Amino acid sequence: MAASKQTSAGPLVGAVVQGTNSTRFLVFNSKTAELVCSHQVELTQEYPKEGWVEQDPKEILKSVYECIAKACEKLAEVNIDISNIKAIGVSNQRETTVVWDKFTGDPLYNAVVWLDLRTQSTVETLTKKIPGNSNFVKSKTGLPLSTYFSAVKLRWMLDNLRPIQKAVEEGRAMFGTIDSWLIWCMTGGVNGGIHCTDVTNACRTMLFNIHSLEWDKDLCDFFEIPMSILPNVCSSSEIYGLMTSGALEGVPISGCLGDQSAALVGQMCFHEGQAKNTYGTGCFLLCNTGQKCVFSEHGLLTTLAYKLGKNKPVFYALEGSVAIAGAVIRWLRDNFEIITTSGEVENLAREVGTSYGCYFVPAFSGLYAPYWEPSARGIICGLTQFTNKCHIAFAALEAVCFQTREILDAMNRDCGIPLSHLQVDGGMTNNRILMQLQADILHIPVVKSVMPETTALGAAMAAGAAEGVNVWSLEPEDLSTILMERYEPQIQATESEIRFSTWKRAVMKSMGWVTAKDPENGDNPVFSCLPLGFFIVSSMTLLIGARCVSTAEE
C-alpha cells in the first residue's frame, strides 16, 4: 500500500505551556495563528507538611516530552509533516524553584512551588536585616519581600538542605525557575545544556534588577545567594539552543515567557495602557506601561512584560492579583454544596439575573489589593427570606467582577490612563453571565478572544519571531486578526456605581474579624511574612491543591 501523502501546513510553531496542574504542548500555524493540535498531561503535587507544596522536576520534564510526542502523533494522523515545526516556545508557572546537579542532571530536591508557604520564618528573618531604606528590595525588583518569590525559596533550601549546600560548595549546583530547568534539559542537559532564563522569569526571583536588566549583586549579597548558580538572562525571543532528543530533535527553542507575560503577548497587548485579565483559580491582571517602569502606590506589583529580541526594548507592566475567582466557585461546590459542577453556577445565576441585594465578599484569608487587610474574613450579607441559592451564585460571580474593578481602578490611578476596554482570557471566561457582569461593573467593554489559548499563543509568537527563525511577524500590519467576542455594558453607569459602592460597604463589614497573632503559637502565619501589612495572594493555604480553572496556569 502506498504511503499516505503528507501535506504542508506552512510554518508551524510549538508551545510548551507548563503550569501548576498540567503540562500542554500546542502547535500553531504561524501565518494564521490558528491552533493545529495539542496534547495535555495532568501533574501531581506533593504536600509534605501543611503549607508546603512541591512537584517532581523529573515528572514535569517527562510530561513535556510526552506532550510533544503525542502532539506530533496527532499531526501525523492528519498527514502533517512534523518537519513543518520550525521553533518551540516555553511558557511556565513563575517563581517555582528548582536546584539540580549540573554533572548528573538530577534535581537535588523537589521543585518548591510558587504558592508554598514554608519560607515565612525566612522572610521574617530577612525583613529584620533590610538596610535603612525600607524599599531596598522593592526599588530594585518591583516586588515586596514575600514567600511568593524565588529568592526566599532558594534561601530556605540553602539553609535547610545539606545536599544543596554541598553541591553549592563543590560547584555542582544550578538554580532556575521551571523554564530554566526545561530548557537546560531539552538542549542537552549534562551534555552541554543551555542554562538560561528570560527577563520575565528572572524578574520574579527577587534577585534581578528590573532597571539594569541584570542579576543584582547587592540583592544576591542580601539573600546570600551565590551568583555562580544563576542562569544567564536572555530576552523573551531568541534562539537559546536546539532540542537534542525526542520527536522534535534539532528544532530551536526560541521563545520563553512567564505565563502571565505570555498571555499579555498572546492577547497582543503591545501598546501602553492595554491590559488583560486572566480568570482562573484567581485573576491575574497585567497592564502594559510601555518602556516606563511604573511603581504602584496602590498595592500592585511592577514587573517586566516582555523583551521580544536581544536588541529590542524591554516593556514593563503593573500586575494585580485577585485571589478568589474560580476558587469561589469551587467553594460553592465543595464547601457550600449548592452545586455539583462548576458549570451550574451560570445556570443558577441566569435563573434570577440579580443578587437581590445579596453581596458576597470571599475574603477567606483576608482582603488583598487595594486593602491589604489580613483581619478580614468572608461574609455573605444582605440576606432576606427571599434569598436562595441562585442569588448567592449570582453574588459570587459579582464578587469576582467587583474585585477586578478594584484592581483596575488602582491600575488607572497608577498609570493615569483609563482603560477603554478589558481583554480577558482563562477558563472562567466561558461563563457568559460573568463576562456580561464584568462589562456592567467596569462600565467598559470586555473583549474575549474566541481562541482561548492565549498563553500558548504568546509563547509561540515569541518563538516564531526570533532572529534566525523569522516565521512569525510581530509587525502590527502582519498580526493575524483574532476573532473577538465583545460584551458591552448593558446598565447605566449610575446603577453600576451604586452596586459597586454597596459592595464596598460589604467589604468594610468584612474587616476586623480576626487579629493577626504570633505564628509561633500555632496561629495562621499567612500574613506575617509581609512587611507593613503587604502580602501576596499566593500566600493562601486555600489555593493549595485547588484545580486550575484557567487555560493559563500560574
Swiss-Prot record:
The GO molecular function terms of this record are: ATP binding; glycerol kinase activity
> Where located?
Mitochondrion outer membrane; Cytoplasm
Q: In which pathway does it act?
A: Polyol metabolism; glycerol degradation via glycerol kinase pathway; sn-glycerol 3-phosphate from glycerol: step 1/1
Q: Which UniProt keywords apply?
A: ATP-binding, Cytoplasm, Differentiation, Glycerol metabolism, Kinase, Membrane, Mitochondrion, Mitochondrion outer membrane, Nucleotide-binding, Spermatogenesis, Transferase, Transmembrane, Transmembrane helix
Q: How is the protein disposed in the membrane?
A: Single-pass type IV membrane protein
Q: What is its EC number?
A: 2.7.1.30
Q: Which reaction does it catalyse?
A: glycerol + ATP = sn-glycerol 3-phosphate + ADP + H(+)
Residues that hold ATP according to the record: R24, T281, G326, G427, M428, T429, N430, N431
Question: Which positions does UniProt annotate for substrate binding?
Answer: T20, R94, Y148, D259
Record field: transmembrane: 526-546
Q: Mostly located where?
A: mitochondrion
SUPFAM superfamilies xrefs? Actin-like ATPase domain
Q: What happens when the gene is disrupted?
A: Male mice are infertile due to dysfunctional spermatozoa, which exhibit unregulated ATP production, disordered mitochondrial sheath formation, abnormal mitochondrial morphology, and defective sperm tail. Spermatozoa cannot transit the uterotubal junction due to reduced motility leading to male infertility. Spermatids exhibit abnormal arrangement of crescent-like mitochondria, which causes a disorganization of the mitochondrial sheath.
InterPro entries (alphabetical): ATPase_NBD, Carb_kinase_FGGY, Carb_kinase_FGGY_CS, FGGY_C, FGGY_N, GK1-3_metazoan-type, Glycerol_kin
Query: From which residue to which does any coiled coil extend?
Result: none
UniProt note on tissues of expression:
Testis-specific.
GO cellular component entries: mitochondrial outer membrane; mitochondrion; sperm midpiece; sperm mitochondrial sheath
Q: What does this protein do?
A: Key enzyme in the regulation of glycerol uptake and metabolism. Essential for male fertility and sperm mitochondrial sheath formation. Required for proper arrangement of crescent-like mitochondria to form the mitochondrial sheath during spermatogenesis. Can induce mitochondrial clustering through interactions with PLD6 and up-regulation of phosphatidic acid synthesis in the mitochondria.
Q: Which family does it belong to?
A: Belongs to the FGGY kinase family.
Q: How does it assemble?
A: Interacts with PLD6. Interacts with ARMC12.
Q: What is this protein called?
A: Glycerol kinase 2
**The organism of origin for this protein:** Mus musculus (Mouse)
Q: Which gene encodes it?
A: Gk2
